[in-house]
Amino acid sequence: MRSAESVNKNIVTICIEPEESIETISSIADLVFCADWAKVAADVVAAAKEQGAEHFVLFSINRHITNNPMYSALNASFKAECEAQGLNYVYDNSVDPIYSSGIKGAQLYIKESIARLFNNEKINGNNIALFSTDSSVQSTLVELARDRGLIYVCPSFPTAYNGLGEVFDKEQVG
């Protein structure tokens, strides 16, 4: 963005739903749009409960939870909403896909984590809602929901297609 601004001083930079630190993004962007994540948490947990969830598993990464106050607040909102709705809340700090293990490593971690949670009796049955702040693992959550009969409530970003096309081998148009 700084390179573009050096060529055109009138360029306006807008960031929508930053995954990085607000401090970092706001030093680059002229305008930042973010969802009301407390409302998102309330809506997602309510939808999970409506679909029969008794457990809610949130996967996130350190870069989101520690570097981005919005995601940190999201974690707290999910926990509070789960308590209010009577759902067992489980947080799992997962592998960041930008590091050495990459996206495949992050996806593998999610699969192994679900197995560990079952083995350690942190969750049971198929009344388990899955959510992650990491867009690179959405297809893994969809696969787990499909293959194990779990609940995939929605992706982390406001799109109905994140992860679905990959799993169901559908071309996304538009």
Model-derived segments and spans:
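Loop/turn elements at helix/coil->beta-strand transitions in domains of secreted/extracellular proteins
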Residues: V7-T13, S27-A29, Q51-F56, E83-V90, ...
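Short, well-structured alpha-helical segments in soluble
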Residues: M1-E5, G105-N126
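Short beta->alpha junction loops
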Residues: V32-A35, D92-L108
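Solvent-exposed loop/turn segments at secondary-structure junctions
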Residues: P18-E23, N62-T66, D96-Y99, S135-S139
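Periplasmic-binding protein-like
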Residues: M1, I11-I16, H55-S60, N124-S135, ...
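An alpha-beta-alpha
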Residues: D36-D92
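Flexible loop/hinge segments that line or gate small-molecule binding clefts
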Residues: A4-A38
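Extracellular/periplasmic periplasmic-binding protein-like sensory domains
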Residues: A29, F78-Y89, S139-G174
